[in-house]
Amino acid sequence: MSAEGAGPVPSDHADRIRWNAKWAAGSAPSFTPHLLAVRALALDLPDGPVADLACGPSGSVLLAAAQGRRVTAVDVSEVALGLLGEEARRRGLVRQVTMVHADLAAWSPEPGSYALVLCIGFWDAGVFAAAAAAVADGGLLAWEALTAEARRAHPDLPSAWCLAPGEPASLLPPGFGVLDQSEVPGRNRRRLLARRASSIQ
């Protein structure tokens, strides 16, 4: 596993400990691609790799790799990345996938380097800004995260982990067009699909 643009994750990192425990104790992952990833990968995309942030054992990574894309899979849990790597190897896709064990807050992707940046179930405004900057001309940014409504059911959930009204579309930098932003019915989540304009006219 590499640490592209990031330092090592400390052994006492709270999220690392929590997610390692979850994936170590849980049942085998289904590796079903997320619907937002399926939709994004079916659209017109420029050449180039895909990044899946806070990926877990992601079927979306495997789908992109099976379509011939090189994929960067970033997660704070090496247990999750290990499960994903085993499945990629089983499917003959391991050479397509780069595992990055990193805290996303410390991960610094190269600007304009990805045809698609995907993130499901995680929110941090700073990470969102870095992810948007990493999208290539003509590429897509696909994001799904909890909304503030989730705090009604889970009052201890930090507000910084939840989307405010209008987000994340309202935080897109200039040059992006929103293809869709919508609520996920019954999930207290919101999805965004946005495209960076191409510089080629």
Residue ranges of model-derived segments:
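A short acidic, Gly/Pro-enriched loop at the edge of an enzyme's catalytic core
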Residues: 109-116
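Conserved SAM-binding loop of SAM-dependent methyltransferases across substrates and taxa
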Residues: 57-67
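A short, conserved alpha-helix within the catalytic core of class I
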Residues: 123-134
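Conserved SAM-binding motif I beta-strand of class I
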Residues: 70-75
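Conserved class I S-adenosyl-L-methionine
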Residues: 1-45
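Conserved beta-strand signature within the Rossmann-like core of class I S-adenosyl-L-methionine
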Residues: 139-146
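Conserved SAM-binding strand-loop segment of SAM-dependent methyltransferases
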Residues: 92-104
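Conserved SAM/SAH-binding beta-strand->alpha-helix loop
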Residues: 77-79
